Structure formats: C-alpha cells, structure tokens
Amino acid sequence: MIFDEDSSSVAQESGYMGVGSPYSSDVGRISMSDHWNKLTKPSSIKVVNHGNALNKADLIIEPLESGFALTLGNALRRVMMSSLRGFAVYGVEIENVLHEFTSISGVREDVTDILLNISMIRLKLSGMDNKVLSLKVKGPCEVRSGMIADTPDCTILNKDLLICTLDQDVDFNIKMYVNSGKGYVPAVKRKSINKFGLSDVPVNFIATNALYSPIKKASFRVESSRIGQFTDYDRLIMSVETDHSILPDEAVALAARILQDQFQQFINFDETDEPHQKVDTKDVLPYDSNLLRKVDELELSVRSYNCLKNDNITYIGDLVQKTESDMLRTPNFGRKSLNEINELLASMNLHLGMKIANWPPESIESLSKQYSEE
C-alpha cells in the first residue's frame, strides 16, 4: 500500500499558503521547537464510565488541532487492538484425550467445542508470565470457568463462562496452560513453529487459539471543539471496552506510550542544540506566565469582560482563585459567560477555584511586563 500526499495539499487543508507560511521560503527562520511547541495541546482528558461498568468508558480529549483527532484516534485504536499484552490459555491437557477430533463419554460437547470455550476464558496473572491451571470436576453438572479456583497470582475475570456440560456421573480433569502475549495467535501457527514455551511437551498436549488482547472493543469519533471564539478545533472521543484486566484509560495510556516509543526512533536531532533554548536561572520567576497576564488580553465577550472589570479582576491570577459560585454571584454574569471563561482557562491548563500561594506578588506590574516580553 502506498500513501502519498504533497505539501501543497497539506498547506491548502491547513490554511497555510503564500509568503511567511511554514511552506514558504521563510521556513529557515522558524525555530525547530516551534514545530511542536506552537501546536495546541489537549488541556482536558475526561473519562466517562458507562454506568457501573468500570471496563467501559468514553475518553474525551480536547482541544486538538484540526485534523489531529482523526490522526491520533486511528493510531491509538489500532495500537490498542493489536499491541497491548494480556493473558490467555494457549494449550490444554484433557485426561484420556489425545487430540481435538474426538468426544468424551458423558460430556455433551465434543473436544473442539470445549477448546473454543476455553479460548474465551479471560484471566489475569500477577507477578508471572505463565502458569498451569488445574480443574477437576465430577458430574453431572455444568462446568464453568469460575470453578477454576482463584489464587493470589491468578484471577478469572469471566467466571460464568460455560466450558462444557457433564450429563453423567463422570470425572472431567483438565490442565490449562496460560502465558502472556499480544494479539491473536491461532493454534495452527503455534504448532507450525513448535512454540509452546515448554521444555517437554506432553504427549496429550492440545494447542488452542489464544486471544491475548485485553481490548474487546475500541472505536472513536471526531467532533468540533472551540477555544474562545475559534471553533476550528477537534474533540476526540475514544470509546473503549476491556476484558476487566485493565481500565479503559489505562489502555489508552499504554497505547500512547507504545506510539511514543516507536516515534522516538524517527527523531534524528538533539533538541538541546538550539542556542535560544538555554535558560538563565536568574530570570526564572515563581509564577506561571499565564497567571500574570491581564484579563483584557483574553478574547472575551464584552459582557464577560465588563463583569470582570466591575468585580476588580485585573489578572488571570485573580480570576482563577474565584470559584464558579463566586462568579455566578457577580452582577450580569451568567452561565454562558461562565462556560466561556472555563474554556479559555482550560486552554491554558488552568481552572476556577485554584489556590495560589502568596498572591498577588510584590511588583506585580513589573513581573507581568517581564513575562509579556519573553
């Protein structure tokens, strides 16, 4: 498969064309770090669970640069589905059974059906990569995965899964071999390379299909987001369902870490090579520069700005120490103005109700001026 796209189409799509754009001859004057530092980064990652099910959740990530939600969402989804590691049964020993193409006296299901059911067992090991589980049952009864006793290092996650049905007074004894892996490994592939992880393969060992992925479902959708008056930003909503071995937000975090590790190999420059990135410690000040900005620098509606002005709120540092209740008690300040301010603060990784020690600082005017000149 070949994917090709020229810079002119990217420029048109992004709105960068003509003199002074990143795609013109002025590119040599752009600081290297500007390529990533001047992009909008998500200021909010919200996890919304589906009712009481901790294994199902939507992750809402915003704001993102236009087009980034599709790029990141597709990459995260594919990595989650294919590359996260989990545990699965990869082989069994069933007493008095030499191969899968047979039946067991007194057992309703044949061996192929039993193996299919066993491959659907979801479990989690702690402190180890492989283990042998034993199950001994006497009929008549339904044999379920919950009959495999939990141990300190092994937890069965779907205890109601039916393994087989014993219709008669028969013994059903089975050993299940568990290990860690990723993706889906069919039994035929494991047999073809003799990869069982065993020093001595038992004569009645039967390989099973192994589904290691802890992800049951993963999808995403893209919506519009806004910062202040600008609406050309993306909101990414990742919908993730796991097998209970990890939480949805953990799955997304692991996928992001895998991508980070892979992309690191493409970076062929040293970020510390840029002279302008050297920091003189005598110029380091104790406050986030955004806190020292004046509220009249924000792109607020006239109503919102006048409300702040009338309440003697001059700096963003003054604003963030107010609670939502404080703001709503301000004359003429309503829910619409509150949402506007919350969105602007979120874009700076700030929020209402913050506690800032020793505020306001002495010489706040000079500090504000110093930050504005940086």
UniProtKB/Swiss-Prot annotation:
Q: What class of enzyme is it?
A: transferase
Enzyme Commission numbers on file = 2.7.7.6
* Assigned keywords, A-Z: DNA-directed RNA polymerase, Nucleotidyltransferase, Transcription, Transferase
Provide the reaction this enzyme catalyses: RNA(n) + a ribonucleoside 5'-triphosphate = RNA(n+1) + diphosphate
One Pfam family hit: RNA_pol_A_CTD
InterPro entries per record: DNA-dir_RNA_pol_insert (IPR011262), DNA-dir_RNA_pol_RpoA/D/Rpb3 (IPR011263), DNA-dir_RpoA (IPR011773), RBP11-like (IPR036603), RNAP_asu_C (IPR011260), RNApol_insert_sf (IPR036643)
* Residue ranges, annotated region (Alpha N-terminal domain (alpha-NTD)): 1-270
A GO BP entry is: DNA-templated transcription
Q: What is known of its domains?
A: The N-terminal domain is essential for RNAP assembly and basal transcription, whereas the C-terminal domain is involved in interaction with transcriptional regulators and with upstream promoter elements.
Quote the NCBIfam families the UniProt record gives: PRK05182.1-2 (NF003513), PRK05182.2-5 (NF003519), rpoA (TIGR02027)
Protein's name in the database: DNA-directed RNA polymerase subunit alpha
Annotated organism of origin: Ehrlichia ruminantium (strain Gardel)
> What is the gene called?
rpoA
